Amino acid sequence: MVSERIMLGNKRGKLLNQYVPNYVLYDLETTGISCNYDEMIEISALKVRDGVIVDEFDELVNPMRPIPYAASAVNHITDEMVAGAPVFSVVLEEFLDFIRDDVLVGHNINRFDMKFLYRDCERYFAQTLTNDFVDTLKFARLCLPGRKHYRLGDLAEVYGIPTEGAHRALNDCKMNQQVFEWLAKEKTSVPTTNEKEILCPECGLPLKKRSGRYGEFWGCSGFPRCRYTRNV
């Protein structure tokens, strides 16, 4: 049974778009891109305190199915590598005990990694993950507006961070952690977000109240790149 120390509950954590000095940065490798039927095959994480890595987590996972060639071509994880690995229900409990109630950080996790974690927490423990999280893809758009690409490798190149070993979870974590710390320095030149501002669930930028043909509505400040709207 999952430890009572692990932060599970009925309400998912919030998306933050700000720097935090203490966090767990994580990355997943999977058999594909769909959380409807794909499975995790590797999960890695770095525990960070005041911007410094203090602990690591790195586990391969046996998905109990063949890994598609297309996935192996990207992450270089093969069936032979995971044959003796534990199943994900075991690894997930270890991972949850590692992260505790820390803020989670990762690249594009709002649209990808968090969905897998929510799914499997609910699948194995009948509760969901309550940790707040920062998506460095959205944070980069806030700190470095106007760039054409915000892929992790592109951001790493901006700061001269080596990209060797990309697409293995632990290597991506180390790259992403450095990017996040550099973005935090960029953030000092970006106006502080009012805590009462509502963030766009699509891109993480603040929503602004606008007027249209049918009255007032909330629209993303990232328009026209992001066209998210909602009723007032």
What are these regions (language model features)?
Residues 224-232:
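Short metal-binding segments enriched for Cys and/or His
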Residues 133-150:
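Short alpha-helix plus adjacent loop in nuclease-associated cores
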Residues 2-118, 122-123, 127, 145-167:
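Conserved non-catalytic scaffold segment of RNase H-like nuclease domains
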Residues 200-203, 220:
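Short cysteine-rich clusters marking metal-coordination/redox-active sites
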Residues 182-198:
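Mixed-charge, glycine-rich, non-catalytic linkers/tails in nucleic-acid processing enzymes
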Residues 168-181:
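Acidic, divalent-metal-coordinating active-site segment for phosphoryl/phosphodiester hydrolysis
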Residues 153, 197, 217, 223:
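Residues immediately within or flanking Cys/His clusters that coordinate Zn2+
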Residues 211-219:
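Short linker/helix segments within small regulatory modules
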